[in-house]
Every structure is written in C-alpha cells, then in structure tokens.
Amino acid sequence: MGMRMMFTVFLLVVLATTVVSFTLDRASDGASAAADLVARGIRGNCCMFHTCPIDYSRFNCP
C-alpha cells in the first residue's frame, strides 16, 4: 500500500469513528432525558409526604 492509500484509509476510519460516536451520543442524550422525566415524576409524587425526604433522600427531594 502506498502512503496516499494508507492516509486515505486512516481518514475514512477517523470519519467513521466520528460519525458513530456522534450518533451514539445523540441516542444516549435522549435516553438520559427520558430517565430524568421518570425520576421527576417519582420525586413529584413521593415528596408530597412529610417523611419522604428522609425515607427517599437518594432522590434529592426538596
């Protein structure tokens, strides 16, 4: 393989890695947002009770 061919293959690998990484990052952001909404729903219903902040301190109830 010549130097140009090796450089071209290197650039293609870098481009493919960047595209895959960007796509996976966007997908994980959506999953994180969905998990945050679920957690907010749990916290909202849970913390109406006066003992909830003590019992469920891991949820950071206000």
UniProtKB/Swiss-Prot annotation:
<comment type="function">
    <text>The short (45-61) amidated synthetic peptide inhibits the rat neuronal alpha-3-beta-2/CHRNA3-CHRNB2 nicotinic acetylcholine receptor (nAChR) (IC(50)=1.16 uM). It also inhibits Cav2.2/CACNA1C voltage-gated calcium channel (IC(50)=398 nM). In vivo, when tested in rat pain models, this short amidated peptide increases the pain threshold.</text>
</comment>
<keyword id="KW-0800">Toxin</keyword>
<keyword id="KW-0732">Signal</keyword>
<dbReference type="GO" id="GO:0005246">
    <property type="term" value="F:calcium channel regulator activity"/>
</dbReference>
<keyword id="KW-0528">Neurotoxin</keyword>
<dbReference type="GO" id="GO:0090729">
    <property type="term" value="F:toxin activity"/>
</dbReference>
<feature type="propeptide">
    <location>
        <begin position="22"/>
        <end position="40"/>
    </location>
</feature>
<dbReference type="InterPro" id="IPR009958">
    <property type="entry name" value="Conotoxin_a-typ"/>
</dbReference>
<dbReference type="Pfam" id="PF07365">
    <property type="entry name" value="Toxin_8"/>
</dbReference>
<feature type="disulfide bond">
    <location>
        <begin position="47"/>
        <end position="61"/>
    </location>
</feature>
<feature type="signal peptide">
    <location>
        <begin position="1"/>
        <end position="21"/>
    </location>
</feature>
<comment type="similarity">
    <text>Belongs to the conotoxin A superfamily.</text>
</comment>
<keyword id="KW-0629">Postsynaptic neurotoxin</keyword>
<keyword id="KW-1218">Voltage-gated calcium channel impairing toxin</keyword>
<feature type="disulfide bond">
    <location>
        <begin position="46"/>
        <end position="52"/>
    </location>
</feature>
<dbReference type="GO" id="GO:0035792">
    <property type="term" value="C:host cell postsynaptic membrane"/>
</dbReference>
<keyword id="KW-1015">Disulfide bond</keyword>
<keyword id="KW-0108">Calcium channel impairing toxin</keyword>
<dbReference type="GO" id="GO:0005576">
    <property type="term" value="C:extracellular region"/>
</dbReference>
<protein>
    <recommendedName>
        <fullName>Alpha-conotoxin Vt1.27</fullName>
    </recommendedName>
</protein>
<keyword id="KW-0964">Secreted</keyword>
<keyword id="KW-0008">Acetylcholine receptor inhibiting toxin</keyword>
<dbReference type="GO" id="GO:0030550">
    <property type="term" value="F:acetylcholine receptor inhibitor activity"/>
</dbReference>
<keyword id="KW-0872">Ion channel impairing toxin</keyword>
